[in-house]
């Protein structure tokens, strides 16, 4: 979707009712006002769109205009604000002929360098290089690959003092993990900031003795490569597959008794995997299965989490029921399992609404680990 005013414009990707403003395409537009009214012209290349290779195309589309001073929004195809999926109420444009989807293939190589001064005022320089690849497998599925990525220019997190027993989850700012990830986050169990960032102390704390401390905690873990395939087929089945590999990272440990130092591995070679199957159903309903897994080399623990989430609406979309089930396991010397499940229901349309009324059951691991 795109929005424009006289001097500004933006584009976003819509997933259900969520607008992802980090979505960025190449397109052009022009806005004008004359005695006949307000006009907007858009020029969007076919490479920015996904459509099948058929002789006659039928597309969904909608147009809207917002008038802020009246708090008014007018749409070409009427939209019911009580329904959750804006896209399902798009208008139809039929009979588009003689267009061919272009090859969707992009290579984006990069080189970067960093210069810093050490404690002895010595100039230290580092160089990095890698590549991003995007390939349209077909009109439904897209492959994204990043090789030796450099996220040094990504916005830093704000400093937060955490005095609670729970971890603070920060927003994801790395472009590879924000584009086309709607399916991966739908079940709420995939937290991409685990990949390629500072290692949790619970991963390496059993290697440090009481009279020792880390000399330095690296702020990130080298990400060797990551890839994802995502899209939705004609039958409404959404597919998402993700894989990421991070390198081994070591640091020094200081012995507070004799001032000696030794080297330990704080982050082993790790492989992260995510699989998502998301099926659209009638009445704006859906069912989603997600599985996340991390494998770590050596004696470090591995983990697996699976989730099933479904939402069922009545034909009128007045009433709904949600259900989700999550099962997790931590594998080291022995397997520890945990699970949670819950449901909620309510009336979401009409002059009288209620809910959601919910219930949640949780059984945690005997040994809690990140």
Where are these predicted regions, by residue range?
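Short, Lys/Arg-enriched charge-dense amphipathic segments
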Residues: 19-25, 82-83, 165-172, 181-185, ...
